[in-house]
């Protein structure tokens, strides 16, 4: 675990009960918010007390995926702007037992670019929520605000669809998150500068991989390498392949796990996949949550399997 000077914890603190999950994706349009809503519903159906947080600051739409007729009057923006003091006070009922929603902060300009002290306050209060699972739906891309939400999670999940752009962006997200985590663990400015330089593929230090980075740090500060290795070992993202249309799409998750091990030196897990079904999007247009409408459908069953795999930290067998 490490903390920045501003007080932001960049790795999760062990808990006996509550878990923070985050659902990210390197690009938009991959069904991430709908998957977050579906997972939240499934977890609540399993008896978990769940708060969904729409952390797509500036582009909140999780309320629509849940079938709410209108955006909630109270949002994360009210907490950020200190209109309320407790983050619990902006959590609203969804109509599903055990599932509440903290809607995103798209109700004021600049929500996506909150200041560092505001971010620290939000993240630290999220850690104190009294529920079984906090499930955060993150925005797309690799902005630091998005990555910092991902890094405080106990379970960080990357959603991909079986398309080259989505796969490339997911890999880029994981690499950026890893380097952001390592920078948070660095204790000297020289080491921080080396890590920051590594984000530029054309950096003067010739750093292309985390192994190159560790070698560069060892030359500068040999005593810092062990702590960075521990951070790398503790970083464990999960992958979910969404909108699967055929058997050939399923191995994409295994390919990402292999790429992370080979090129980034980290352990990751392929947690599961969800098939595409046009009926899902028809439900969205009618403001209905598909998994609640058709719990016996293939996508709903796969979401249930995914929830169990994430709870148990299980990986999809290579035979898939």
Model-derived segments and spans:
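G-domain G4 guanine-recognition motif of GTPases
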Residues: 26, 160-162, 184-205, 227, ...
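P-loop/Walker-type NTP enzyme "switch/lid" segment
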Residues: 55-132, 188, 196-208, 218-222, ...
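Conserved ATPase-coupling elements of RecA-like P-loop NTPase cores
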Residues: 112, 138, 142-149
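NTP-binding/hydrolysis catalytic cores, primarily Walker-type P-loop NTPases
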Residues: 266-267, 281-320
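Beta-strand-loop-alpha "switch" segments that mediate conformational coupling across diverse proteins
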Residues: 234, 241-243, 260-290
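Walker A/P-loop NTP-binding active-site region of P-loop NTPases
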Residues: 19-87, 133, 146
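Acidic-aromatic/histidine active-site loop/patch
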Residues: 1-20, 307, 312-320
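Inter-motif core of Ras-like GTPase G domains
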Residues: 127, 145-165
């Amino acid at each position: 675990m490490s903390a920045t000077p501003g007080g932001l914890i960049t790795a999760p603190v062990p808990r006996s009960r509550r878990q923070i999950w985050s659902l990210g994706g390197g690009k938009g349009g991959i069904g991430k918010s709908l998957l977050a809503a579906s997972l939240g519903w499934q977890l609540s159906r399993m008896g978990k007390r769940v708060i969904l947080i729409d952390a797509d600051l500036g582009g909140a739409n999780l309320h629509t995926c849940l079938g709410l007729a209108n955006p909630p009057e109270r949002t994360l923006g009210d907490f950020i702007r200190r209109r309320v003091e407790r983050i619990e006070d902006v959590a609203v009922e969804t109509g599903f037992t055990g599932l509440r929603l903290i809607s995103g902060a798209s109700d004021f300009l600049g929500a996506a670019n909150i200041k560092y002290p505001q971010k620290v306050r939000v993240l630290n209060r999220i850690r104190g929520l009294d529920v079984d699972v906090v499930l955060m739906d993150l925005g797309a891309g690799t902005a630091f605000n998005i990555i910092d939400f991902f890094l405080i999670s106990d379970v960080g999940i990357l959603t991909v669809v079986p398309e080259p752009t989505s796969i490339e962006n997911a890999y880029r997200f994981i690499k950026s998150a890893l380097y952001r985590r390592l920078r948070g663990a660095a204790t000297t400015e020289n080491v921080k500068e080396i890590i920051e330089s590594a984000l530029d593929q054309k950096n003067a230090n010739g750093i292309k991989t985390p192994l190159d980075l560790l070698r560069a740090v060892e030359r500068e500060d040999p005593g810092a390498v062990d702590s960075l290795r521990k951070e790398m070992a503790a970083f464990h993202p999960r992958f979910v392949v969404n909108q699967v249309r055929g058997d050939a799409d399923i191995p994409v998750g295994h390919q990402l796990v292999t790429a992370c091990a080979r090129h980034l030196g980290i352990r990751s897990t392929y947690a599961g996949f969800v098939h595409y079904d046009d009926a899902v999007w028809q439900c969205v247009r009618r403001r209905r949550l598909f998994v609640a409408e058709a719990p016996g459908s293939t996508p709903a069953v796969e979401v249930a399997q995914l929830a169990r795999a994430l709870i148990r930290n299980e990986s999809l067998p290579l035979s898939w």
